[in-house]
Amino acid sequence: MSGGRFDFDDGGAYCGGWEGGKAHGHGLCTGPKGQGEYSGSWNFGFEVAGVYTWPSGNTFEGYWSQGKRHGLGIETKGRWLYKGEWTHGFKGRYGIRQSTNSGAKYEGTWNNGLQDGYGTETYADGGTYQGQFTNGMRHGYGVRQSVPYGMAVVVRSPLRTSLSSLRSEHSNGTVAPDSPAADGPMLPSPPVPRGGFALTLLATAEAARPQGLFTRGTLLGRLRRSESRTSLGSQRSRLSFLKSELSSGASDAASTGSLAEGAEGPDDAAAPFDADIDATTTETYMGEWKNDKRSGFGVSERSSGLRYEGEWLDNLRHGYGRTTLPDGHREEGKYRHNVLVKGTKRRVLPLKSSKVRQKVEHGVEGAQRAAAIARQKAEIAASRTSHAKAKAEAAEQAALAANQESNIARTLAKELAPDFYQPGPEYQKRRLLQEILENSESLLEPPERGLGTGLPERPRESPQLHERETPQPEGGPPSPAGTPPQPKRPRPGASKDGLLSPGSWNGEPGGEGSRPATPSDGAGRRSPARPASEHMAIEALQPPPAPSQEPEVAMYRGYHSYAVRTGPPEPPPLEDEQEPEPEPEPEVRRSDSAPPSPVSATVPEEEPPAPRSPVPAKQATLEPKPIVPKAEPKAKARKTEARGLSKAGAKKKGRKEVAQAKEAEVEVEEVPNTVLICMVILLNIGLAILFVHLLT
């Protein structure tokens, strides 16, 4: 057998013995670009026993087969340690995975690298779960046993993934909180949940129900469903107890807070009962599990005597069941998200009450049957656990043998190539230093966080802070000249704050965008639009112009962007002085000249066609009454001119009166229509509620 050093094209290298052109005997090999290292024994190009070290510092010590971990071995990955069997690169069939920082561990069977079959989970506080697993989750039948309440871990945040979580690595250390059921409301959680405890003080069913349009004081509000009204209603024990938990608290594996989905009522309602729990009280759940949650039939009981037997859904009492209180009283019926919605005590409808009682009995029988099966599965899990412990001890012996082979390979590599770089020890040193830094940071983090959040202290030069602040002044950016809605927005307060200038929209007179001191292309693009926007904005706020002597020009200026003459030529000034009409006419002209300022910005665009000039002539049918007496005292020589002016004034007044009449009709019609619609909607809702209450 010969030996030496061989460098690969991908940057890796091998230093050790070989035979037949393949690695054989003992040797050390690095991966592509020198990343990763294996040191140990080889068999014609394949690893046999040794130690593989990743650049992160994670290691595997054990046996290999066909280039994959196979047999017995120990994997150190982050803060987790796996000892047991390996099958073609995956954990299993029997093994133990435990946390190096806490007492959390799993002992049992595995499949494809996940907990599968039967096993025992032990959590950081000492609580346990024995039963079935599927794809890394508690699924099937099992028994969850908590530690005394005073020793149970306190869950402070549903988003926090504890080191005791055995399934947290599959979600990269972060676990999303359990979403509430689709038909259940989001409700506040109790203040201090404990791992493994699902029994918590809750509010009454009335407090948990969403408040509708009709309260208890109304006629429809007095229609109630049949529910328990016995002595439980006057006692503190009447309140619902069973509550969702973190799939078994932060002490459970990769479980997150379903606490936000279950508690009815305010947080302070839960405090009295939590304070009354004895520190030695324990809790046990025996029954079905689905997707890592209590779902199906099951029994949950406390050492104090509190007990629930019935159906569960997502760690909540959901279905038919019975709650037995420590004083012997019972609360039974149909539960919905931990709240009793149908009881059997009030016998308003005897037939319906008997059906509910039958379903409750069926739920209790199913829960007792599920509890018996769960105890059997727990016994099987205990036997699997003992077998996994034996495999873990054998894996420790295999790791010792692998380390011996690794030391031999390193010694041989130094002899064959003294200058050969061995990255494995360096990786492990980095990992140790990183752990020391993380531990020191964990000790310093709480006081830093207690002082305050870091976001307000971010410097003003930070681009993120700058981006957060700039959208506020840019809420109304200057628009192109062809968009009239922009000058309309600031119109009500423009006279006070002068917000119509293009620069004022950005908060600075000469700036564009969020960086006024830096010229940008966007500013150059917007500059051509400034004159148009300024003209439109200022035109809307100009004082009314002097009354013109030609009403036709003022009227049709709303339809055209220029003055259009439709009446006869202007009479000489002497004629205007002799006519008695100039006094009432300016009033009409002034009243008409004021509204065109806002209307002129919209009417010309919405109704641009000019042929509307002959249309108003047909509408002037009701006007001769006020105009005829004014035209009588005029001289006959100027009847033609006076008639032209009177007709124009009549047309103008007619249009104004018709427009005012239409606006009045619209306002009169809108109010009763809205009221009627609201009344009809409320009536329909009331009838629907009445119908539902009568049916239920």
Swiss-Prot record:
Proteolytically cleaved by calpain in response to cardiac stress. The major cleavage site takes place at the C-terminus and leads to the release of the Junctophilin-2 N-terminal fragment chain (JP2NT). Phosphorylation on Ser-165, probably by PKC, affects RYR1-mediated calcium ion release, interaction with TRPC3, and skeletal muscle myotubule development. A motif (Bipartite nuclear localization signal) lies at residues 345-359. Residues 457-471, 631-644 have a biased composition (Basic and acidic residues). The record marks V155, R156, L201, L202, R565, T566 as: Cleavage. Residues 573-585 have a biased composition (Acidic residues). Changing A399S: Decreased transverse tubule regularity and aberrant calcium handling in septal cardiomyocytes. The modification Phosphoserine is found at S162, S165, S440, S442, S462, S479, S527, S533, S593, S597, S613. Disruption phenotype: Null mice possess cardiomyocytes with deficiencies in the junctional membrane complexes and have abnormal Ca(2+) transients. Mice die from cardiac arrest at 10.5 dpc. The chain crosses the membrane at residues 675-695. Interacts with TRPC3. Interacts with BAG5 and HSPA8; the interaction with HSPA8 is increased in the presence of BAG5. Belongs to the junctophilin family. This is Junctophilin-2. It comes from Mus musculus. The gene is Jph2.
